[in-house]
C-alpha cells in the first residue's frame, strides 16, 4: 500500500533524528540529505545514457546497500559511491562517511551507517517507476528535512534555509509569473544557501528558466546543487567557496559583473565581515561608486547594492534585510537617499518577527525594479508602496510562520497596489518620503497599532452603551438592520425627566439571551441560509471538476485552481473574510486532501 507524503516525511525525520545521537544537527543533515540524494538519482537516472546526472558503475544506491554491515563501510562509501558520483557530476564538498569524530568509530560507525541506509530502503522511496509529476515528493522531502534541520541547528547554523512561505512571497512579488519567461530568462541568488529561494522563483515561472547561485559555504553549496537536481533543475549553475562581495563568480564576457533578469537574496543580517578580502573604496565592480560605501560593521547595503549592480536595466529583485536599513543614519542614510532618488526601490514589505532560523529579529523585503528608474529613462516612479504584514502569522513551535492566507494577502495587496486599508498598506509619495529625510521606517507611514479601547466616563458613571460603540459594528447592521433595533433601544433619561439620553443605548434583552436572540433573528437566519447555499453551490461545482480531472491531474495545479476559485467565490461576501475561507481549504489540503491526491495521481 502506498504511504502518504506526510507519513513518509515524518517517518524519515523521526528515523534520522533517532540515529543522530549526540551529533549537531547542522552536521548530521549533510549525511541524511546526501543519502536522500543518492537514492533519488539512482532511481531516476541509473542506466540512462543521456541523463543529466551521471551514475558511475558501482556507485548507485544498490551498491551502497551491498556495503551494509561491512567493517569498512564508511571508507567504501567514500571511495566507491560518493567520490565517483561527485567527480562525475562536479559536486563539491561532500561529507566524509568515515569520520569517527562525527559518526563514531568501529562498530558504532558501522551500525549508524547501516541503519541510515536502511531508512532509505523504504519502498515508498522507490521512484524508478513513478510518473514525472510524482518527482516532487522527493524534492519536497528534501525541503522538509532541511526545514527541520534548520529548526534544530540553532542560532547562525540555520541560515542555509529561507522559510518556504517567505520564499513564495518573494517569488511572486517580483512578477515572474506574469512575465513571458523562456530558457534564456535568468534568475540569480548571490547568497543562495541551500537553493530553496531560487527554486521557489523557478516554480512561479511559466516556462523553465536558468538558475544561478553563489554560496560561500562549500558544504551548503553542495546541498544547493543536490536540491536543484532533486527538484528537476539539474542544469542550474551553483558555485561555492567564495564570498559574493569579495569574489563574485559570475562574470560577463566584458569582464564586468554578469547581469540577470531577476535577483533574489536572503543575505546574512548585518554582516560585520562583509568587506573581508574587498577594498570598498576601490571596488573593481563599481557597486558602491554612485551610492556610498556601507559601514564597516553593517553589510546589509553592500548586499543590496550588489543586487542592484547584478540586475539588467529591466531587471527586478527582492532582498530580505533587517529593518535597520530603513532608518539607520550616516553612510546608510546617504545610500538609501541615492537609491530612492534613482527610483530603484519599488516597495517595502514588513514581515513578522521570529520568522527566520538563526535570528528572532523582524525583517523586511526590499523590492527593486530597475525598469521604472530614473537612470534608465523611465521615470514613472511616483512613490514607494509600503506594506505592514507584521501581524499576519501563526505560532509554529518556537518560531512564527506565515500562513497560506498571509502569503496570498501580501502578494495580492502588493501586486494591485491596494491601499484600501491604510493600516495595512499604502502608496507613499516621494514628496512625503523626502519630507521625512528619506527615512523609510514603516511605522512613519503606516499606523498598524491596535486602537485602544475608548473609555466613556459618562457611560461608566451613569450607565448606558455608547452609541458610537454600537455603530462601530456597522458591517453587521448593514446585513441585519432590524437586528440592531431588536438588541438596542434609546436609553431613557430616567429620573431626570422625560425623553432620551442622547448618544447612549439600552440593551433590550437579557445578557444571557444575546446569542440566542441573534441566531434566531430572521435576518441573521436568512444570512446564514444564503451563505450555506453559496458554499454548497461552490462545493457542487468543485466536485464536478474533481470527477472530471480524476484521470490525470497534478495535485499542486489542482489545489491552485480550487483555492483561487474559492477566493474569488467569496470576494464580495459581507462579514466573511475571503482569506479566512481560503485558509480553511488550505488547512484541509495540508492535513487530509493532499495525501489522498498524491496517492491517486
Language-model-detected regions and their locations in the chain:
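Non-catalytic, mostly N-terminal accessory regions of nucleic-acid modification and defense proteins
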Residues: 1-178, 239-249, 350-353, 381-388, ...
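Conserved Class I SAM-dependent methyltransferase catalytic core
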Residues: 7, 11-14, 18, 27-37, ...
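Hydrophobic alpha-helical scaffolding
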Residues: 106, 131, 213-217, 262, ...
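Conserved S-adenosyl-L-methionine
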Residues: 156-265, 270-291, 301-302, 321-324, ...
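Extended hydrophobic-aromatic, low-complexity segments
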Residues: 272-277, 318-319, 328-333, 348-349, ...
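Conserved P-loop NTPase
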Residues: 365, 369-411
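Glycine-biased, low-complexity coil/linker segments
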Residues: 494-497
Amino acid at each position: 500500500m502506498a504511504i502518504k507524503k506526510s507519513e513518509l516525511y515524518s517517518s524519515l525525520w523521526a528515523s534520522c533524528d533517532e540515529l543522530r545521537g549526540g551529533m549537531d544537527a547542522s552536521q548530521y543533515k549533510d549525511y541524511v540529505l546526501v543519502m536522500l540524494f543518492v537514492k533519488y538519482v539512482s532511481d531516476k537516472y541509473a542506466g540512462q545514457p543521456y541523463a543529466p546526472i551521471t551514475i558511475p558503475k558501482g556507485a548507485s544506491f544498490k551498491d551502497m546497500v551491498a556495503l551494509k554491515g561491512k567493517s569498512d563501510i564508511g571508507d567504501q562509501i567514500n571511495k566507491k559511491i560518493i567520490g565517483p558520483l561527485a567527480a562525475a557530476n562536479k559536486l563539491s564538498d561532500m561529507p566524509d562517511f568515515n569520520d569517527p569524530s562525527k559518526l563514531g568509530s568501529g562498530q558504532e560507525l558501522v551500525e549508524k551507517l547501516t541503519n541510515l541506509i536502511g531508512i532509505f530502503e523504504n519502498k515508498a522511496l522507490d521512484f524508478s517507476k513513478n510518473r514525472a509529476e510524482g518527482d516532487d515528493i522527493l524534492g519536497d522531502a528534501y525541503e522538509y528535512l532541511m526545514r527541520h534541520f534548520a529548526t534544530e541547528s540553532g542560532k547562525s547554523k540555520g541560515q542555509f534555509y529561507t522559510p518556504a512561505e517567505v520564499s513564495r512571497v518573494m517569488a511572486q512579488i517580483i512578477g515572474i509569473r506574469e512575465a513571458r519567461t523562456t530558457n534564456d530568462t535568468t534568475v540569480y541568488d548571490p547568497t543562495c544557501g541551500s537553493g530553496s529561494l531560487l527554486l521557489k522563483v523557478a516554480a512561479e515561472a511559466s516556462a523553465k528558466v536558468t538558475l544561478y547561485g553563489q554560496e560561500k559555504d562549500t558544504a551548503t553549496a553542495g546541498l544547493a546543487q543536490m536540491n536543484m537536481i532533486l527538484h528537476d533543475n539539474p542544469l542550474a549553475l551553483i558555485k561555492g567557496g567564495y564570498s559574493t562581495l569579495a569574489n563574485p563568480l559570475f562574470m560577463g564576457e566584458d569582464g564586468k559583473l554578469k547581469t540577470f533578469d531577476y535577483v533574489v537574496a536572503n543575505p546574512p543580517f548585518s554582516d560585520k565581515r562583509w568587506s573581508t578580502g574587498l577594498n570598498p573604496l576601490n571596488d573593481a565592480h563599481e557597486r558602491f561608486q554612485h551610492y556610498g560605501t556601507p559601514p564597516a560593521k553593517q553589510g546589509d547595503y553592500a548586499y543590496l547594492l550588489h543586487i542592484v549592480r547584478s540586475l539588467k536595466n529591466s531587471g527586478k529583485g527582492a532582498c530580505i534585510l533587517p529593518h535597520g536599513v530603513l532608518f539607520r543614519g550616516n553612510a546608510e542614510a546617504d545610500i538609501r537617499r541615492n537609491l530612492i532618488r534613482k527610483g530603484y526601490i519599488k516597495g517595502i514589505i514588513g514581515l513578522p518577527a521570529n520568522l527566520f532560523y538563526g535570528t528572532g529579529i523582524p525583517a523586511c523585503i526590499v523590492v527593486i525594479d530597475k525598469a521604472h528608474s530614473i537612470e534608465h529613462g523611465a521615470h514613472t516612479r511616483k512613490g514607494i508602496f509600503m506594506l505592514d504584514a507584521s501581524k499576519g502569522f501563526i505560532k509554529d513551535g518556537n518560531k512564527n510562520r506565515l500562513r497560506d492566507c498571509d502569503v496570498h494577502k501580501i502578494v495580492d495587496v502588493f501586486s494591485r497596489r491596494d491601499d484600501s486599508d491604510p493600516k495595512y498598506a499604502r502608496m507613499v509619495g516621494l514628496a512625503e518620503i523626502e519630507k521625512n529625510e528619506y527615512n523609510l521606517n514603516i511605522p512613519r507611514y503606516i499606523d498598524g497599532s491596535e486602537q485602544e479601547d475608548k473609555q466613556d466616563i459618562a457611560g461608566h458613571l451613569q450607565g448606558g452603551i455608547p452609541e458610537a460603540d454600537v455603530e462601530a459594528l456597522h458591517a453587521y447592521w448593514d446585513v441585519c438592520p432590524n437586528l440592531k433595533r431588536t438588541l438596542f433601544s434609546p436609553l431613557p433619561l430616567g429620573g431626570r425627566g422625560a425623553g432620551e439620553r442622547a448618544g447612549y443605548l439600552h440593551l433590550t434583552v437579557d445578557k444571557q439571551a444575546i446569542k440566542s436572540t441573534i441566531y434566531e433573528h430572521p435576518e441573521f437566519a436568512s444570512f446564514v441560509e444564503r451563505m450555506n447555499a453559496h458554499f454548497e453551490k461552490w462545493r457542487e461545482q468543485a466536485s464536478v471538476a474533481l470527477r472530471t480531472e480524476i484521470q490525470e491531474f497534478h495535485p499542486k495545479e489542482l489545489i491552485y485552481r480550487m483555492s483561487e476559485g474559492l477566493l474569488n467565490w467569496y470576494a464580495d461576501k459581507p462579514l466573511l473574510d475571503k482569506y479566512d475561507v481560503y485558509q480553511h481549504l488550505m488547512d484541509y489540503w495540508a492535513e487530509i486532501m493532499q495525501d489522498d491526491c498524491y496517492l491517486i495521481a
